Amino acid sequence: VPSRLTQEEANDVTLYAISLVGTPYRFGGNTPESGFDCSGLIGHVYKTRARVAAPRTVAALIDWGQPVPAPSLRAGDLVVFTQKGVTNHAGIYVGEGRFVHAPSSGGMVRLDALKSKYWSQQGVSYLRP
C-alpha cells in the first residue's frame, strides 16, 4: 500500500509520537503545550515530523489514508476505531502491536496494546497516510 511518507518520515513520526507519551489530554488540543485530543495528536505529529497535514477531526481521518490489512501494518500507520458505525477515536501505530493515542479517559497521551482487553473489543481500521 503506497504512503505519503518516506520510511524515514514514518520512523520520525513513530519516535516523536512515543516521546509525547505523558502529555496531558485536552479536548480540542493540538500542541504539546496545550495538550492533545486524539486527532490533535495525530495532526501535530504528522505535520511536524512528515510535513503532512492530517484532517482535524477523527471522523475525517477515515477518508485520509489508504486501507491497510492488519498483516501489512507498519509503524507510522493510523489506527482508527469505530463504535456502532461511528468513527470515534484514532492513534498512531508504533510497532509490536502497540499504538500511541490521546484518550479522554486517563487524562494523558498513552502507549497501549491493540490486543488489550478494551481495545481488542473495538471495531478497528488501519490506514496508511
Language-model region placement:
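Catalytic cysteine-centered active-site loop
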Residues: 1-4, 23-75
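ATP/adenylate-binding site constellation spanning eukaryotic-like Ser/Thr protein kinases
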Residues: 18, 22, 96
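Compositionally biased, proline/threonine/alanine/serine-rich low-complexity intrinsically disordered stretches
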Residues: 1-19
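Structural motif
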Residues: 76-77, 97
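Solvent-exposed polar/charged
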Residues: 19, 47-48, 92
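Aromatic- and glycine-rich peptidoglycan recognition patches
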Residues: 1-4, 68, 87-88, 94-129
